[in-house]
């Protein structure tokens, strides 16, 4: 979104319309450059993958992605083909003739965009020469021992070389190149230093130094204007990377960030105010299960319940129908991802549930990849015991059913004692004995390499959440990404999320936050913070986020202890909801997915391209300055109906409502009517100038 200007999601009612002149894409070439093209490392791959269809629909054959070549990724994700564009074909051929290995094909994702992949290893012999070129271009030296930075220099040099070959054969077509993150920034710096006729955009999804500082328990956001940036980068031995990032920012015609909170950070860390904020979206169609997401929730919840039965065998004294599944997922950044405050809140939640003698049990999953040796033997044994018991029950059921069937055919009601013989009783007793357990259920599914120093396990030991019988909160650390081929929890991430009740992401540093956004489009409530880009985005668009299943923890203006208490209250309030209240909340959450669709948020990228063309080629392209529409904007309103039983949604609800809610059935609730009201109300994006100044924290408050 343009700074100080309200762009809109025009297909939603109640929004001011931004009339943008369509770009002549048939006379343009668009390249997006990222280290995560066909190479998933973090969230940038999700951004590019989900946005690909929208961009490909707009640009057609003139849209290309540039990334690194890895043999495994090429075999499984890319279909090789010949370039149809003459300029691109000549550029690929020219580089291959000079000894580079350039691969071209279609990425096998929705939209099937073209990809150009460079083999870094085949060009490594040029490293010393390219280091000299880079030093002459911007005065930044790259240490020999930093292999990642050296790889980025090779990648950037190949990118700049390729773009030069393209512009030499473009036949009058103008070229736009968008570079994502500092890893791709070297190509931008070299392209500008060589004065290539290219309109450039640089997008930062997070600042290098910001991530480091936040991980050090520093009151980051309230001291942004006080940091000695060069000193901080030097102390962390990332000064050369910081210089590469900052040079990329200042060389670009247009600088964009993914959220307002990151825009503030970038202005202080990188010394340039972003021109456009480009919020991250999702391909909502990918996640939509038309009117069936409630049924999918029930189906995948049953699979999680199966895992829990095995994991807690011998201690399964809680009702699985009154058990809530919570989870946190992401990179293993203990403080940045909010795992520290989450664990402390779970300890307090456990105390509240026990004190109030609640019959609700909470099982919490930590899906955060870490270094492991192998699977935990106790965890594997639990799943084996569960499967064996299931097979035993099926065998007895068939035998019991046959005897019952024969008796009824004879016109007799069989004696129950005669149906089960001595062997059957012996089998059942052996099954019961097999479920006996002397030890507590493990808190981790794998054997950790650094068990004694692992932050999550160390905190679990401190707060005492060991999965005791008396605990109402149970904890399971799954230090590996989910996979449908896992012998423990054979589910993909999307299936797992749909089966859970609440995603909890109380991050301290989260430039955007895809995990709560993915929960939203799948109709799963989530917890986020006002320090995440997604949390700020929702606060500005939704009048009562909590009613729509998005709980926003204040981590900017409250002390860590107060934030922890607020999160505890959110979790405790969620535990007190009835089943039908949760069904209503999931319906409302799913409706917010309209806000996150790339079909709407993609227009901010469109504007960035307009802007960079007008700056790079002012004689050919002109962007008329437009003042903000005369409107105060709209918000998704507070829901007008409060009853906990949605009569209109019961057809798609897989479960019956709790008996204690029957007295509310006479209150009218029309799901479709409320949904239509909600879709007609939305607030336009806010201006950076209205962001409030934070409250100072006392020294040491962040060291929980």
UniProtKB/Swiss-Prot annotation:
UDP binds at residues 40, 331, 515. InterPro entries: Glycogen_synth (IPR008631). Its EC number is 2.4.1.11. Coiled coil: none annotated. Specifically expressed in liver. The modification Phosphoserine is found at residues 8, 11, 627, 641, 645, 649, 653, 657, 684. Pathway: Glycan biosynthesis; glycogen biosynthesis. UDP-alpha-D-glucose binds at residues 205, 211, 331, 510, 512-513. One of its GO terms (cellular component) is cytoplasm. Residues 647-657 have a biased composition (Low complexity). Keywords: Allosteric enzyme, Glycogen biosynthesis, Glycosyltransferase, Phosphoprotein, Transferase. Phosphorylation reduces the activity towards UDP-alpha-D-glucose. Primed phosphorylation at Ser-657 (site 5) by CSNK2A1 and CSNK2A2 is required for inhibitory phosphorylation at Ser-641 (site 3a), Ser-645 (site 3b), Ser-649 (site 3c) and Ser-653 (site 4) by GSK3A an GSK3B. Dephosphorylation at Ser-641 and Ser-645 by PP1 activates the enzyme. Phosphorylation at Ser-8 is not required for interaction with GYG1. Interaction with GYG1 does not regulate the phosphorylation at Ser-8 and Ser-641. Residues 658-675 have a biased composition (Acidic residues). It comes from the Eukaryota. Residues 620-704 are annotated as: Disordered. PANTHER family: GLYCOGEN [STARCH] SYNTHASE, LIVER (PTHR10176:SF1), GLYCOGEN SYNTHASE (PTHR10176). Glycogen synthase participates in the glycogen biosynthetic process along with glycogenin and glycogen branching enzyme. Extends the primer composed of a few glucose units formed by glycogenin by adding new glucose units to it. In this context, glycogen synthase transfers the glycosyl residue from UDP-Glc to the non-reducing end of alpha-1,4-glucan. This is Glycogen [starch] synthase, liver. It comes from Mus musculus. The lineage of its organism: Eukaryota, Metazoa, Chordata, Craniata, Vertebrata.
